[in-house]
Amino acid sequence: MGSLAKKVLLTGGTGFIASHILTELLDAGYQVVVTVRTHDKGRQLLESLSNTGDKAASYVVVEDIAKDGAYDEAIQSISDLDLVVHTASPYHFNYTDPKTDFLDPAIKGTAGLLASIKAYAPTVKRVVLTSSSATIVTPPNHPEVYDETSYGSVTWEEAMVPQVTYRASKIFAERAAFDFIENDKPNFDLVTINPPLVFGPKPRHVTDLKALNTSNHIIRDTMLGKWKDGGAPIAIPFTWVDVRDVAFAHRQALELPEVSGQRFFTVAGHFSNKRIAEAIRATHPELADRLPPSDVPDDLPEGIYGFDNSKSRKVLGMTFRDLNTCVGDAVTSMLEQA
C-alpha cells in the first residue's frame, strides 16, 4: 500500500505502544490523527512532538470508547481517511468492575469503532488491531510451541476472575473484530498484531515514572532496586518483544496487501526477572549495586512453552531486537526522569 502521505487514525494515541506507532508512522511519511480522552492529553502529546518539527500529527477527543457511537463524531470529522490502527484497550490492574472497567472498553470499543468506520469512512481500506499473545496462549495447558494457528479460549464467567480479565478482554475483542468482518462485510479488511509483554523506551510525553506503562514496571522496579533482595513477582507470560519492533509490525501490516485477514505473533524471546536484571547489569554497570546478586538462579521455568515467530519474520520482514538492547534503551530513557 505504501504511505504516500496517507491518512491514518490511531486510537489510544497516548498509550505506550501507540506512541511508538505514531513515531513509526510519522517517520514513514503518514499523516496521523490520534484519539485521546481529553484535550489536555492531546495537547501534551503534540507538544512532545514539537521538537521534531513534525506537523503531520493531530488529535480528536473520544472520551469513553465503550459508549455506543463513541467514534462516530471523530470518524466523521476526518476527511479522506485511508487506514486505522486500533490500540485503545485497557491494560492495567487498577480496576474495580471487570465488565465496566475492562471488558466493555475492549470489546465494545473495538466493535463500535469498526461499525463507525463502516458507516462513515468508506475510504478506509484496512484496520490493524493491536491484539495480544493472550489470544494465542491457553494456560495452564500449553502446547510445546505456539504460533498464529493457536487460539486462546475463555468463558465469560472466567473473565470475571481478576487474573483472567485482561486475557479475556483481548480474546473477546479479537473475536468481535473478525466476526464483524465476516458478518458485516465492510469496505475494509483486518490484520491483527499479537505481541506478548512489550518492553522498551518510555514515550516522550511521559515525564513521571509513576505514570509508566504497566509492562515496563518490571524494568523500572528492578532498575530502582526494588527487587535487590528478592521478592519480584513471577515474570508471566515469560515472553517479550521490543515496542519499536511492535510499531514496525503495525506499519508493515498497514502497507502489505498480502497480509489481509492474518494474525501475527510478534514475539522476540523468553525473559525472566533474572534476565532483566542481567540486561541492566550489562548495559548500565553503574546500577549494579541496585540489582540482585549475579549468582541468583534464573527464574525462567524449566520446560517453558516455545514459540514460532517465523511468520512475522518472513511476511512482515521483522528482525527482533535482543533483550539487552531493549532493556538497556528502556533504562536509559527512564534514567532521564528518575
UniProtKB/Swiss-Prot annotation:
Keywords: NADP, Oxidoreductase. It is an enzyme of class 1 (oxidoreductase). Transmembrane segments: none annotated. Its EC number is 1.-.-.-. Induction: Expression is under the control of the azaphilone cluster-specific transcription factor azaR. Pfam families: Epimerase. It comes from the Eukaryota. One of its GO terms (molecular function) is oxidoreductase activity, acting on the CH-OH group of donors, NAD or NADP as acceptor. NADP(+) binds at K41, Y166. CDD domains: AR_SDR_e (cd05227). Pathway: Secondary metabolite biosynthesis. InterPro entries: Epimerase_deHydtase, NAD(P)-bd_dom_sf, NAD(P)_dehydrat-like. Belongs to the NAD(P)-dependent epimerase/dehydratase family. Dihydroflavonol-4-reductase subfamily. Ketoreductase; part of the gene cluster that mediates the biosynthesis of azaphilones, a class of fungal metabolites characterized by a highly oxygenated pyrano-quinone bicyclic core and exhibiting a broad range of bioactivities. In the first step, the non-reducing polyketide synthase azaA forms the hexaketide precursor from successive condensations of five malonyl-CoA units, presumably with a simple acetyl-CoA starter unit. The reactive polyketide chain then undergoes a PT-mediated C2-C7 cyclization to afford the aromatic ring and is eventually released as an aldehyde through the R-domain. This is Ketoreductase azaE. It comes from Aspergillus niger (strain ATCC 1015 / CBS 113.46 / FGSC A1144 / LSHB Ac4 / NCTC 3858a / NRRL 328 / USDA 3528.7). The lineage of its organism: Eukaryota, Fungi, Dikarya, Ascomycota, Pezizomycotina.
